[in-house]
Amino acid sequence: MCKQLIAAIGVVIAVAIPHAQSRASGVPAPESVFGFAPGADYKLATYEQSIAYFKKLAAASRCIRLYEAGKTTQGRTMYFALISTPENLAKIDRYREIWQRLAHPQGLDETEAKKLAAEGKALVHIDGGLHATEVAGPQHTPLLAYDLLSRVTEPAVKAMLDNVVLMLWPTINPDGQQMVAEWYMRNVGTPYELSGLPRLYQEYVGHDNNRDAYMLNMIESRAIEHTWRQWEPQIVYVHHQSGPFPTRIWLPPFSEPVGVEAPPVIAREVNMLGMAMAKGLDEKGQPGATHMGTAFDAWYPGYIDYAPVFKNIAAYWTETALYQYATPHQYTIDEFPANVRDLRPQSLYSSPWPPGWWRLRDAVDYMETASLATIEFAAKYKDSLLLNRYRAGRDQIALGVKKPPYAYVVPQQQRDPVAAVELLRRLAFGGVRVSQLTGDTAIDGTSYPAGTWIVPTDQEFAAMAREVLDVQKYPDLRQFPGGPPERPYDAAGWTLPLQMGVDVIAIKTPLSVEARAGMKLLGPMPDPKVKPTPYTASSADAAPFDSVPGAGFDTEAGAAAIVPPPGRVTGTGPILWVDAAQNNSYRAINRAWKMGASVSYANGRYGLSTLSEAQQNELAS
């Protein structure tokens, strides 16, 4: 195992870790870099400090490896750490093969899957969150890493790390952590101590940065998705802060409604994890855990912390109480809502939190307890987690064979041809496989030409395709019978073909042998032998048409193969007219301006003049 030395006890960590007698030698504490303990009053560690600490850990312990995941919007490097035993980390390539094989179950039977599950280890993603003003998340991850690495010889910790590889992200919004920490520390002790950051902590999107799971517009979202598809965790846990007052932490089960395409066994795992975390909190004497309620539902698949459910991963978030930043606050009973001032235990709120002080360190400790409970759960049930990943994917494949829609057909000829490409590229980047017809083919009684795209639903991530391509039917939930409807927590509908103006046909009859013979898979099947790489940063746009900037979706072969039909110039004349209804036209207009063209507008079209014939053809291609 890792080095060890008898040392003084620090903060006692939670769940299965008992009162300890030793710390492993050479494992530095966060204070050695931060100058203060994580969660200290009036103190926030920046992202740069956090990464400096994780690098120090990686240099000191054989139980941690640090990986680059990609670059942020502002150019910072995103990192995640793998924490486990040295023996497990030495076999990480083999375990990654197992995770990939179970995630993509084609040709794998139950017997072989059970053998792989028994051989493998659970892979658990935990991160410090992405809402940067919810400051406890990225303060708890360094402490979690330290408490695991410095106690690796303790039986409880060893039992966890023997069976789990922890994928720990210090934060998934590095830019935001840096901005918010610097802003708060600049204002501590002034009248502006609690003032809000006067700019978006995630460029362009702000607080909605966790609503990018299927559109993948943010470079950070693509870096995370790219990493997930290379490693395929069985659990994804994202920390948030804003639990319903006066509770101290909200945990799954979710409130109603939940996603109709969520695989049942995965939904059950999420519920079990929520209860395991609550149990761990009560065992530690940390009251105030609650579940369900009317706030946090799981209807919307845009959450980066819930969308993985539709790829057969137990994904969820929690909401830990927050006052403001690292400033402590003392609550009185008069601040509590009148209906909970009696502190009466409830079915899903069995240990009411009494009023008193609430500090950043309290939130950090609650988060660490919940994280450790998640790791402990994964260690105890690792065979089940691995096997259920296989079973859920297998069942999705079977569902696509026996229940419509059996596929989605996307013609190349569209009102905006590039919009169809953009929709499909996002699905493919997220692991949904897309095929293309090689010739004229009849499907569901209609003949489709070569080049038509097909998304079959007999594939393991088909639930994600159905979630975003079908029309949502929000349930009729009332506050009481005959009363007003309950307000949706977030989006009630998001049908991408309607939002993006793309013609998508749901196929109601099974794909024939002839139809399948005419389909060519775009990109290879996942290959676990391919070594993981960071999401590529590029200043040049990979796609010559209107798409996300930089490397975009081209780092995934299946997505890169989805391209619009070549454009062409028809007719003759001095003015090139482009359709104002097509997004790609505006890219062409900007390129034309750079060529020195004049731009006019008439009858719903833009006219680009003073261009040579060669320049016109270049813009249309």
Predicted regions and their residues:
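Positively charged n-region of N-terminal signal peptides that target proteins for export
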Residues: 1-4
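Bacterial N-terminal signal peptides
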Residues: 6-16
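Intrinsic-disorder/low-complexity accessory segments
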Residues: 21-165, 205, 211, 217-219, ...
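Active-site neighborhood of phospho(di)ester-bond hydrolases with catalytic His/Asp-centered motifs
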Residues: 127-128, 169-171, 236-239
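Acidic, glycine-rich active-site loops and adjacent beta-strand->loop/helix elements
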Residues: 130-132, 170-176, 213-215, 243
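Carboxylate/His-rich catalytic cores and anion/metal-binding grooves
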Residues: 145-149, 163-185
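Proline-aspartate-enriched helix->loop->beta-strand connector
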Residues: 228-242
